[in-house]
Amino acid sequence: MERLELPFELRQKSRLRARLASGEEVRLMLARGTVMRGGDVVTTIDGREVEIVAAKEKLLHIESDHLARVAYHLGNRHVPVQVGHGFLRIAEDHVLEDLALQLGARVSHIQAPFEPEAGAYGHHHE
């Protein structure tokens, strides 16, 4: 099965033209509101199945003894947040990095796949 590596920004699009690892162009037309996750299998317009790979992105990895407080403040800014066991991840942003540091968090710059929460009313794609 072919694989299609995409950053989070492109995995949110319902209409997409992209290139497979082989260099071949494919087109996707998904239901509005669909967010593709790493490991999802989608069908291209021409009927082929393609596995979605979450691309590595520049992220802020945030740890804190008061993680709920940091999450609350990030949530007030309506930014996508990946919630893990003992950490939060957000796209690199110097303003939000400063905010997290002011709240006493430990922040590191990493490159990793970004899989933020879908939200209370987000579409869950299986």
Regions found by a protein language model. Name each.
Residues 1, 10-13, 20-22, 90-126:
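Helix-rich terminal scaffold detector
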Residues 5, 11-77, 89:
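Compact, glycine-rich, soluble single-domain proteins
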Residues 25, 80, 106:
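Residue-level detector of anion-binding/catalytic polar loops
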